[in-house]
């Protein structure tokens, strides 16, 4: 077999492949064995028609398409290897010659990976992120943890305040007419949660139990119910009950409840500070890496094939479908609720898809330029890390993946990202007051 590659305009080229006649004849033999089982010829049992009779009756041409189907996949794969091209989409194939006793010749218009012209990726100016944990951040984390242990207590006296949970009855109307879904009794609402129409919760602040009030709000222009979007509504509202969160004091006992390894408040704070400091350092490093990736990608010039963007869009839509499925929705239901269709969703995602493709191509090109590879030791370390993270054995991970190619590529790219950050020039950011 022979193959030639002729680069055309942009990221396309013409792959011309010639398969020797010997293989063509073998493929025709295979095609005949398949086709003969499916035809009826008077005087012969099904599947027992001699080849000469078959060709006399139907012509050898009746076998050509099946022979092409047999020859094409392997021939195309071998041609890709021989010419060392990297297709990014299915080719457009045109058969030039298929005939018994002659070579099989076909042409394939192939879109290949684009040329990547790297710009500067070392010495990038990156903003140095703050890693020191402040006392305020520690206290905020403590308050957040104590908040999970808070109990809701009925407020006997007093008024509704931000953070309280109120039990209310309400009836909404637009232009004096009640609308569907605008009425409820015994509804619990946390003030400040932002779960109601903008302006509603704030107007309940200062109200007392058994007090009634007309709450006037305007539905957002982008409200999902088109008949209400942008309209002013009045909600006749009554407060039935007010509850507030009673947060426990941080004692040695509570500290142990929050952290089994801490027996005192001081031990709890020390352990928490250590964990938060480690997380802040990790988060800071990740932000710095993201900035380095973005700048290296921005400095790179690539003519990205539309086929690669479409493939990435397919992946992103699939990821989106999986996310909303976890919320009990499927894509069609989401489209009905949102008023979008898949075309609009893909258009909305297109810029991100292009950026993803450009980033991946940039990082891969840097890996090649720097001759960065993932060693067996690197892969073993990553497998051990995954084993601890997901609490499953290394062997089970290998069996699930089938091979370690994905891990190998991930580790390789992570090494590139480390290189970008390690070679960056850090500058101090402007601290906010």
UniProtKB/Swiss-Prot annotation:
Q: State a GO cellular component annotated for this protein.
A: cytoplasm
Q: State where the protein is found.
A: Cytoplasm
Any idea of its EC number? 5.2.1.8
Q: Which PROSITE patterns match?
A: FKBP_PPIASE
Q: Which GO terms describe its biological process?
A: 'de novo' cotranslational protein folding; cell division; chaperone-mediated protein folding; protein transport; protein unfolding
Q: Which UniProt keywords apply?
A: Cell cycle, Cell division, Chaperone, Cytoplasm, Isomerase, Rotamase
Asked whether the keyword Isomerase is assigned, the reply is yes
Domain of life of the native organism = Bacteria
Domain PPIase FKBP-type, first and last residues per copy: 163-248
Q: Name one GO molecular function term.
A: protein folding chaperone
Q: Which HAMAP family match?
A: Trigger_factor_Tig
The text of the family note is:
Belongs to the FKBP-type PPIase family. Tig subfamily.
The domain section of the record reads:
Consists of 3 domains; the N-terminus binds the ribosome, the middle domain has PPIase activity, while the C-terminus has intrinsic chaperone activity on its own.
Query: What does it do?
Result: Involved in protein export. Acts as a chaperone by maintaining the newly synthesized protein in an open conformation. Functions as a peptidyl-prolyl cis-trans isomerase.
Name it: Trigger factor
């Amino acid at each position: 077999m022979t193959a030639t590659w002729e680069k055309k305009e942009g990221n396309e080229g013409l792959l011309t492949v010639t398969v020797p006649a010997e293989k063509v004849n073998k493929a025709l033999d295979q095609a005949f064995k398949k086709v003969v089982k499916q035809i009826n010829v008077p005087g012969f049992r099904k599947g027992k028609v001699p080849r000469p009779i078959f060709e006399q009756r139907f012509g050898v041409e009746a076998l050509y398409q099946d022979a092409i189907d047999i020859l094409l996949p392997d021939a195309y794969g071998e041609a890709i290897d021989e010419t060392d091209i990297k297709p990014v989409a299915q080719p457009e194939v045109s058969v030039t010659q298929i005939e018994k006793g002659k070579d099989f010749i076909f042409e394939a218009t192939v879109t290949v990976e684009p040329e990547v012209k790297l710009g500067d990726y070392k010495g990038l100016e990156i903003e140095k992120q703050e890693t020191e944990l402040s006392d305020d951040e520690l206290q905020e984390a403590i308050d957040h943890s104590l908040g999970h242990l808070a109990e809701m207590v009925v407020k006997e006296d007093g008024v509704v305040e931000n953070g309280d949970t109120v039990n209310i009855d309400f009836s909404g109307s637009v232009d004096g007419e009640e609308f569907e879904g605008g009425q409820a009794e015994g509804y619990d609402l946390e003030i400040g949660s932002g779960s109601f129409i903008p302006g509603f919760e704030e107007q309940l602040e200062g109200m007392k139990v058994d007090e009634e009030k007309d709450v006037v709000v305007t539905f957002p222009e982008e409200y999902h119910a088109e008949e209400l979007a942008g309209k002013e509504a009045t909600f006749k509202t009554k407060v039935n009950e007010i509850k507030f969160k009673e947060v426990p004091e941080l004692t040695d006992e509570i500290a142990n409840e929050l952290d089994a390894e801490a027996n005192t408040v001081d031990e709890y704070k020390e352990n928490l500070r250590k964990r938060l400091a480690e997380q802040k350092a990790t988060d800071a490093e990740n932000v710095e890496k993201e900035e380095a990736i973005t700048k290296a990608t921005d400095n790179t010039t690539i003519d990205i094939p539309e086929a690669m963007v479409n493939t990435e869009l397919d992946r992103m839509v699939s990821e989106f479908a999986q996310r909303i499925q976890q919320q009990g929705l499927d894509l069609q239901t989401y489209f009905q609720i949102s008023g979008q269709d898949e075309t609009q969703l893909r258009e909305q995602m297109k810029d991100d898809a292009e950026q993803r493709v450009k980033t991946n191509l940039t990082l891969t090109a840097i890996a090649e330029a720097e001759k960065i590879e993932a060693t067996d030791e690197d892969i073993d370390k990553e497998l051990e890390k995954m084993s601890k993270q997901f609490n499953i054995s290394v062997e089970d991970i290998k069996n699930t993946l089938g091979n370690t190619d994905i891990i190998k590529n991930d580790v390789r790219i992570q090494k590139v990202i480390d290189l970008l950050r390690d070679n960056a020039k850090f500058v101090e950011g402007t601290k906010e007051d």
